Amino acid sequence: MYDDQSSSVWTTPPHCRVQRFRQALAALTATLLSAPLASADPLGGRVLGPDGQPAAGATVTVAGPLAVPATTTTDADGRFTLDLPPGTVTLRAFAPGMDAPAVRVDAGRTDLEVTLAVRAVSEVLTVTGAQVDTPLSLAGSSVSVLTREELDARQTLTLGDALRLVPGFTVARSGGPGTVTSIFPRGGESDFTLVLVDGVRANTFGGGLDLSQVPVADAARIEVVRGPQSALYGSDAIGGVIQIVTARGGPVMATAFAEAGGRAARNGAATVRAGGARWQGAASLSHQREEGFTGPAPADGSAVTNDDSRLSQGGASLGWLGVGGQELTASLQYVDTDRGAPGPFGANPAGNFGGVDRTSRGLTARRMLALRAVQPLGGAASRVRLRAEADVADLDIEFRGNFGSRGETRRRHGRVQLDAAATATLGVSAGADVIGESGRSTFITAGAAEVPIERSAVAAFAEGRWQPGDRLSVTAGVRAERITRDALAANPSAFSARPAFAADTIVSVNPKLTAAWTLVPAATPRGASTRLRVAAGTGIRPPDAFEIAFTDNPGLAPERSRSVEGGLVQTFAGGAVQADATVFHNTYDDLIISVGRLSGTSRYRTDNIANARARGAEVALAWRPRAAVAARGHYTWLDTAVLDVDGAAGQAPSPFAVGDRLLRRPTHQGGLDLTWTGARLQAFATASLRGRTLDVEPNFGAFGGLFENDGYHVVTLGGAWTLASRLTLHARVANAFGATYEDVLGYPALGRTLYAGFRVAARR
């Protein structure tokens, strides 16, 4: 419960009630070519960079009497044009590392001139924190965005490494690259974060996910929303949401990179994207391989020969763009991994080390297919937009060893959503969701049979967004969800017998309220500004397949969270310096635990009787004195505690005591990131710092007792040299000073490792 899970090697298949969504999608598709265009006024102009030269490829977005913000990019001469309904709108222009203040203009003007300025944190249009695209400056929730440019500058290959730059999230990796990687959002458990790839859920049944299985080679950006988001996404978004938005469309562009490094590392990727007036597409391939830890095991000096890992990924998308703003998009992704499982061979605090496992391996294969249709009801410059989505996600997992097992997750999802501008300042969204998912695993039955656990959810949601100008944004949303677990046959296993369960249904309602207010706008181009934001919401995570399979409790309910937060964003020097401070308080209720010695609290083996809380503060500082230099730092103070179980004051689940810290959540953690970009040279340095954590005995988990895991600081240094316009050489040294540490007790991190390679980019 309080999280000693290293990985759940495990499963999920689907039970589908998505037929109505298929019918809706087909009906929507049939109307795409016939929708009439609304009357529209052109809005156009030119975007210039800080040097007064045309800013090609800058993003221009307009909010006003529209269902969703209208967006375009500038051409090679910095020019843009948008067709808009008559009226006054708010225009924003931005590019990586720079933006311009929002301006109010009347549709119909074609002579606008907007000049960008260097910003420590530039504007970006986010798609994860609300039902429609929202500028970062109007987000009431805590949102961080990692761009493709930032990932490339730091030579980041994995989602786990990227998230070490985000305040409030603790990343715990069981060794080197490719090993099991978990994330803890603001003190929540490792299955409290929903991960999306272009809107498709990547989590297993019940919310678990190994981040090492989520590549970022094709990511245009990574959006991270902290705090519960079940009002938007329902189940599993109990502690936060991470979304990988892949690149597509635009001018023809192809990239390829390859590198080699210590421990026989071989990494490579290739991407291509292109688009025109009526179509857009993209494709990507990536591969990562590394031998991992190959020296003597710190626990007893024996050889470690089974710590290697491999990941292969492929993805593609193709979309059609109609003259009236219609969109049809299909996308797919495939990821498979293969890694050794030597077990814990590092710290051995209780002397229970049983030797290195030289034969066990874990294999996974994930497949995702998604279809998306958008129909503005009245043309591109419309007050109303209809959107329909359908996606399929399958995950197969196999563990090969003396106690091998197979598992699978199957999920089918359908969604219909209507977005509308009720007035020039009020936007509304409403819709319905259907999710069918199932999980199977031979581990549950300790045999060849696969127990099927099937669950469906039908939800209705609504959201209102009030934006009376460019300084204030208030968003309120709610989602009501009916979650049904199908009847489950009895399991007579002597290991963990379970009676037959009848079908079980629960209804959950989750609200969310956020507000962002620019209290003091910058009075001059080099002035200061002050922005306040607040957010409150709730979240749920229904039981995973193991929790259902190993209980005798037919009414096991979802785990729940409640959260409030407040933040202050202060900029100086026209945005070249930004300080962002947030305080938060999270309460986690109805956590599922094994009742064990807590007699009198429940008549079942497991029940929703545990509770915990987490409170803390996050501070992020960013400084960009000029376009070539950027510095960022963040610090998180986190105070977590195990609370009394329901019905037993003063008692906590074994081996905890009331007031103990939650596992693997440090009180102090932070990071520092420096980059410099010259005409042909580039350099970066990143540092991650983590304080002491409470952890479990590596070999027997919580049954072996609780132990302290020392903190650490790790530095990575790197740089790149552009030899020609299309060819760049790069190198980096991970763990440059050879720190000895363990994210997860018993699993040593890799020492100093050198990587070197090249990147080729071509565009037309």
Residue spans of the language-model regions?
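Short, acidic Ser/Thr/Gly-rich low-complexity loop/linker segments typical of extracellular
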Residues: P65-R79, D83
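Extracytoplasmic beta-strand/coil segments of soluble accessory domains associated
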Residues: P135, V143, G160, R164-R201, ...
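Structural signature of Gram-negative outer-membrane beta-barrels, strongest in the C-terminal barrel
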Residues: S122, V323, T423-I435, V451-N586, ...
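Periplasmic-side early beta-strands and strand-to-turn transitions of outer-membrane beta-barrels
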Residues: S230, Q243, E259, T271-G362
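Membrane-embedded beta-barrel scaffold of Gram-negative outer-membrane proteins
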Residues: W279, A381-F399, T518-V520, R531-G537, ...
